[in-house]
Amino acid sequence: MQLYLRSILLVFICALAVSTARAASAVPFAQSVPATPGFCDAQSDPSWFKQHAKPRYARGFEVSYGHRTKKVVVRQPWKGAAQEFVYTLICPGVALEAVAGQRSVQIPTRRMAALSTTYMGQIALLRAEARLAGVKNPELVQTESVKERLADGRILGLGSGAAVDVERLVRLEPDLVMTFAMGDPTSDLHPAIERLRLPVVLNGEYLETTPLGRAEWIMFLAYFLDQEREAAEIFSTVEREYLRLSGLARAVRGPRPTVMGGSPYGDTWWVPGGDGYIGTLFRDAGGEYIFADKHETVSVALQFEAVLRRGAPAQVWIMDNADPQQLAQQEPRIRHFASVQTGEIYSARARADYCESGLANPQVLLADTIRVLHPQLLPTHELQFLRRSPITP
């Protein structure tokens, strides 16, 4: 059940779709920055890292710095986890005996295996594609610089679906395997990877409940790549633009446009929880989310009658990668929704790399949502991740 719930959540948050060329946008995507000395560099000032490399929005990890070591704590590796995962990162020259018995990782990472495509946008921003040796589910990758390396063999595919190609992973000889867990012993990969004596790290970014919190996991990745300065500068531009945009939406006077989210999956209608990522995005964009009172951080299952009763008056419907036209054929009653009758339906279907550069650039996701809910605020912004998808008669 946990696996199913997470897959439903990711369907909405990370609508994996076909990448298209980006249209001109009034809101910029984050850009890479020049390389700077890392913590392990002898010329670096350790005090900078202790002051500026700690998360401020992300709740799932923390870091502390020692003498040529970093201690990284993943506070919640999966929803409801009763344990933290602590990793000791060691710079060159530190004796392994000093960290015996600990989950230790030698840094900077040179050969990384990524078992989720959601890290690709941040890897590209850090210009770390050359350090990526393998990726699971390569057919889902949308980041162009990674796709090019997959195509010419510089990055290897590590299997598709829930399984990982263990033999290929071992042959890869990675110095870091980054993956996620759900607390399900039948599907979690990290125990088996640990038994192979490969350094494996759990990334809990998917549990963050705010767009800025999730984007700040670029810092987590940077700890292993020893690129905290670059990550901090990149995230600073993301944060500044996100806060500027949310301030614009917050300043709008009068009633907020009502918005509903989610779509049916089988016989059940799944809507984003009011306290989760999408609920926060709707709120920051100046919308009144009709299911804000569903105080969950993951998607919530509802009967269609409940959705029909509360969702029908909503002015805007922003869904995942579902096909609105197909939904109308399967469930004709949605044609009674106000959003359907006015054509104010937006989806992420066949639009862009929502799950990669979208999560790394929440300021653009926010701009898209503001453009939909308050078009007068961003008249020159062209939608990057959403598209208007009216249902025809």
Language model segments and positions:
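Positively charged n-region of N-terminal signal peptides that target proteins for export
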Residues: M1-R6
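Bacterial N-terminal signal peptides
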Residues: S7-A17
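Cleavable N-terminal signal peptides
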Residues: L10, A21-A24
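N-terminal ligand-binding lobe of clamshell/alpha-beta domains
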Residues: A23-P393
